[in-house]
Amino acid sequence: MVKLTSIAAGVAAIAAGASAAATTTLSQSDERVNLVELGVYVSDIRAHLAEYYSFQAAHPTETYPVEIAEAVFNYGDFTTMLTGIPADQVTRVITGVPWYSSRLKPAISSALSADGIYTIAN
């Protein structure tokens, strides 16, 4: 199992392309923010796959970008698969699950903070 902090740190480093300043303020729709969010999301799906399958069965019209499914089952470097997913889709899939507030939101905030990324509203 890949640790959440490892995924978030790796995603942020790849997205930034070089070492960034100690703190960076970015728009919530910035692709670097989206990649950190998606890294946390993929890690959460891997850790709680049965919950996601149950949610999908109960909500068959909820669709996910195919890149997310590919990333979940590809245990190598998946970050390049997740680039280019529109910010509105990222927000929709991440906030659309019942455990967003209790599990995903705190993990995303922690990962962004650990990477020195702070967000501002669009």
From Swiss-Prot:
It is found in: Membrane. One of its GO terms (molecular function) is structural constituent of cell wall. It holds the Pfam family SRP1_TIP1. Coiled coil: none annotated. It comes from the Eukaryota. Keywords: Membrane, Transmembrane, Transmembrane helix. PROSITE patterns: SRP1_TIP1. InterPro entries: SRP1_TIP1 (IPR000992), Yeast_SRP1/TIP1_CWP (IPR050788). The chain crosses the membrane at residues 7-24. One of its GO terms (biological process) is fungal-type cell wall organization. GO terms for cellular component: cytoplasm; fungal-type cell wall; fungal-type vacuole; membrane. It is a single-pass membrane protein. Belongs to the SRP1/TIP1 family. Seripauperin subfamily. This is Seripauperin-5.
